[in-house]
Amino acid sequence: MPKHLVFGNEPFLVDKMRNRLRSEVKTPEFNLLETDEFTDVEIRFLNQYPMLGDRKMLIFNAYSMKECEVVVDYLDEMNSDNVHTYLFVDEVDRRTKLFKRFLKGEVEEFNKVSREM
């Protein structure tokens, strides 16, 4: 199942990415779920087929990578390409095993550009 990690210290660019993702979903009332917790509701959403569209999208907002561990474990066990999951995380530690589970194409980092020359 496609999963992507999105983080950075530039909130404008992170929000722009989040808004772009929202606009890409056909029939968002059925195929888009944005949440900050992972419960039975989110699991049921992930296991349903997309309605009136070709894919579903889960946007998970978290403060730290630790909050994403349960989500990533569940996604790794699923065998479906119908759901794309985007994990928006405020603080990321690149040294963790969890971070290393994401492939190079699955990580989007948005940082402020320094003006020093």
PLM regions with names:
Residues P2-M117:
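Non-catalytic interfacial helical region
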